[in-house]
Regions:
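N-terminal nucleic-acid-engaging modules of covalent nucleotidyltransferase systems
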Residues: 1-186
């Protein structure tokens, strides 16, 4: 996991890597789309045959996976090789600002623009269910290795506000200040 994160941080688009760090360290609003609204969207789409959704959900056991199976474009090819987190974040934010009835009616058509894997990840990130077994410490260690800095300095610099912009890594790479050295425990 660590080596994969190191490689990603070193090679990915800077904005994408910043958004990934934000998501992996739990710094973002996790539940932009409430699971109850996601279920309502499915029930509305299935209308009189909502029992079919219930059966699918019971068989699959995961709401995001069920919705991805039912509504994603099954013929779409995943575009995950391209930077997508920023685009998804903008979509999530736009959807979260909608009235519930608009969100409920638009969600199935939005999911149909994504591949099954993309829809699954989009829903997991949007509903707060994104868990990958990566601790904050592992992310901090990967960043430290990626830019060849002390992990304690990285952790201290990430304690405050984190702005997931393209310059995030450059700010972390800045030379260590005397204040940072003085604050480091002996």
């Amino acid at each position: 996991k660590r080596n994969g994160l190191v490689e990603f941080i070193q090679t990915a688009d800077p904005r994408e890597s910043a958004l990934a760090v934000e998501a992996l360290t739990g710094r973002r609003d996790r539940k932009q789309l409430k699971p109850s609204l996601l279920k309502q969207a499915a029930y509305q789409a299935f209308a009189d045959e909502s029992w079919l959704f219930d059966e699918c959900y019971a068989a699959v056991g995961d709401l995001s996976e069920t919705l991805a199976i039912l509504f994603a474009n099954q013929d779409a090819v995943s575009q995950t090789a391209q930077p997508i987190l920023d685009q998804w974040r903008q979509r999530q934010h736009a959807l979260s600002q909608q009235k519930p009835e608009v969100l409920i009616s638009e969600l199935p058509s939005l999911l149909n623009t994504l591949s099954r894997d993309e829809a699954f990840l989009f829903l997991k990130l949007s509903s707060g269910g994104f868990r990958v077994g990566v601790s904050k410490g592992l992310v901090h260690e990967a960043i430290a290795r990626a830019i060849n800095m002390d992990r304690a300095v990285i952790e201290e610099r990430l304690m405050g506000d984190f702005s997931p912009d393209p310059d995030w890594l450059d700010r972390l790479k800045a030379p260590v200040t005397q204040d940072e050295l003085d604050a480091k425990p002996l």
